[in-house]
Amino acid sequence: MIFKKAHIALNIIMSFDRYKEVIEEGDTVIIYVNIHSMYSLEVKPEKVNKNGEVTTNIFQTSYGALKVKDLIGQRFGTKVRLSRGYAYALYPTPDLWTRTLPHRTQILYSTDISLIILQLELRPGSIVVESGTGSGSLAHSLVRTVAPTGHLYTFGKFGALFKR
């Protein structure tokens, strides 16, 4: 068993606690093709293929391919060209993140999360301890609620999930 503090992972992988205008390498972007086709994507210009070779990172959608390096320097909300259509590169809001993350664990959705935040009377500056981080759906919303002066401590049993 591996136990880690998830708030560390959230700060390294993505900047959900603050909004930014321009996409940079390492950011998480939501690729919105249509209401039924949304994908979360980490912006890395290159990736290692099955043979161990470094290649251009190309993201495939039902409307064609997107060269991930073309996202760098674009503003969030930009319409991006695919080989057979277009999509939008959106900022990962808590709701979009919950809709696009891989559901390896049971997650809470926005309506339930809103009720939890209301009942706990959370606001900027609050300090929250969460147990059972799982996919990070609740943690993402909690961080956005208590930011910029609050703090979220979240713990979970991760193993391979933490490495993703």
Predicted regions and their residues:
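Short intrinsically disordered, low-complexity coil segments enriched in acidic
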Residues: 1-2, 135
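N-terminal auxiliary segments of SAM/dcSAM-dependent transferases
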Residues: 2-88
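Generic preference for well-ordered secondary structure
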Residues: 13-15, 100, 153
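S-adenosyl-L-methionine
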Residues: 31, 83-118
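Charged, low-complexity, helix/coiled-coil-prone segments
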Residues: 52-63, 104-113, 161
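Phosphate-binding glycine-rich loops and adjacent basic patches that engage nucleotide phosphates
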Residues: 73-82, 102-103, 123-132
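The AdoMet/dcAdoMet-binding core of the Class I SAM-like
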Residues: 107, 111-164
